[in-house]
Amino acid sequence: MRAVVQRVTKASVSVDGKIVGQIEKGIVVLLGVGKDDNIDDTKYLAEKIVNLRIFDDNDGKMNLSLLDVQGSALIISQFTLYGDCRRGRRPSYSDSANPELAKELYEKFIELVRGYGVHVETGIFAAYMQVEIHNDGPVTLLLDSKKVF
């Protein structure tokens, strides 16, 4: 399972011109599910993300987590995180999970993050979305449950 985590001052996601999710201070999580992922990957990333110390403390050091600052999370599915661009010019998505598994683990990830007491907004799984992100810093991190990077 892969995630792009961005610290934001605000963010929103729209489908067909209508906002379906929006947050103020917090994080945007673009989440991709791989074909070999399971519940353990979901648990690992959820715990890791809510506890990442990427928010500034009073001394201006990144020392506080999403939980510490009581921030929100906007979680959006993004299968293209498994795009393999090593050969040719068109990405291959053969490492992405099938839609059924991807939806199941995406929804479980949302449930787990909410279980930490985080206010969560979401996009719509498999929909064509427009995402507006006001990246704060900018702070952008790449995470992989298999620790590839």
Curated annotation (Swiss-Prot):
Catalysed reactions, semicolon-separated: glycyl-tRNA(Ala) + H2O = tRNA(Ala) + glycine + H(+); a D-aminoacyl-tRNA + H2O = a tRNA + a D-alpha-amino acid + H(+)
Keyword entries, A-Z: Cytoplasm, Hydrolase, RNA-binding, tRNA-binding
Principal cellular location given in the protein's record: cytoplasm
GO cellular component term, pick one: cytoplasm
Motif (Gly-cisPro motif, important for rejection of L-amino acids): 137-138
Single GO MF annotation: Gly-tRNA(Ala) deacylase activity
Membrane-crossing segments per the record: none
Group of enzyme by EC: hydrolase
EC number: 3.1.1.96
UniProt keyword Signal, yes or no: no
GO BP annotations, alphabetical order: D-amino acid catabolic process
CDD domains: Dtyr_deacylase
Localization of this protein: Cytoplasm
Family, similarity comment: Belongs to the DTD family.
Subunit annotation: Homodimer.
This protein's domain notes: A Gly-cisPro motif from one monomer fits into the active site of the other monomer to allow specific chiral rejection of L-amino acids.
Function recorded in the entry: An aminoacyl-tRNA editing enzyme that deacylates mischarged D-aminoacyl-tRNAs. Also deacylates mischarged glycyl-tRNA(Ala), protecting cells against glycine mischarging by AlaRS. Acts via tRNA-based rather than protein-based catalysis; rejects L-amino acids rather than detecting D-amino acids in the active site. By recycling D-aminoacyl-tRNA to D-amino acids and free tRNA molecules, this enzyme counteracts the toxicity associated with the formation of D-aminoacyl-tRNA entities in vivo and helps enforce protein L-homochirality.
Name of the protein this chain belongs to: D-aminoacyl-tRNA deacylase
Gene coding for it: dtd
